[in-house]
Amino acid sequence: MTPTNQIHNALYLPFQREQWAELRESVPLTLSENDLADLRGINEKISLSEVTDIYLPLSRLLNLNVGAKQQRGLALNEFLGRVPPKRPYIISIAGSVAVGKSTTARILQALLSHWPEHPKVDLITTDGFLHPLAELKRRGLMQRKGFPESYDMKGLVDFISAIKAGEAAVSAPIYSHITYDRVPDQFQWIRQPDILIIEGLNVLQTGQDSAVDTKRPFVSDFVDFSIYVDAEEELLKKWYIERFLQFRTGAFSEESSYFHHYSQLTDHEATGIASKIWDSINGPNLTLNIQPTRERAHLILQKGQDHLMDQVLLRK
């Protein structure tokens, strides 16, 4: 048994796909094929059967956890004799570039919003808290974009702490994958949702991962339930290259795209560049910063070929 398997056995309850699907019980499928088409990411072939087998049981688990948290809050408030501000239940979704975090987040948002106990579910991505391009260039971090140091961590933590404190309206910067930068003077406003889903590469990071300040709070300190979307690196690199090739004929073809110069590449040239980007940036970031946080997650979704989930690990 490998050390990783030993850790998994010690910390997690493993479920094969069929076992996990049985935990759905009577939760209804509230998404149509058209709904799912709007939620799919680039290069993902997720089906309604995947939603039924994997995401419906997960939405049931999260609904139970949200209810338990709400009941604990009511008991504490009765004891203290106070009416506190509304505080959302916070779910984080972490994982590598190209693993499908955004699709997982969108599907969970859609499913959880159909539960009557928590109809208002908001979703943000940490991309908006990347330093602006000009600042990344000034700091010499353009080849480290996505690494922890490329983020405005203070701004991100201030944002999520304000959410957790129950502030009525909190703003987050908006990021454009076309311009590869923050959108100037545009913000996403979060107004006391029942649930907030926050998706990003490093949302499971803690103080012990920081070379700068081990004592300051991190996103993970404010999260109620954390999910890590996992896959073998060989698959991740393959998916990244496939996605890059699709972007080349899609988003990259727009004149305003930061990567417009890639749109004229041949398949062979584009594959070579995507592979180099993975090997020099995304792969090292996965190995050094993202994957080491995996075992902090409450739940790990393990993907195999074609983005299909083949195992779920639930923390004991």
UniProtKB/Swiss-Prot annotation:
Gene from which the chain derives: coaA
GO biological process per UniProt: coenzyme A biosynthetic process
Protein name per UniProt: Pantothenate kinase
Organism: Shewanella piezotolerans (strain WP3 / JCM 13877)
Keyword match Nucleotide-binding: yes
Places the protein is found: Cytoplasm
Chief location bin: cytoplasm
Residues annotated to bind ATP: 95-102
CDD domains linked: PanK
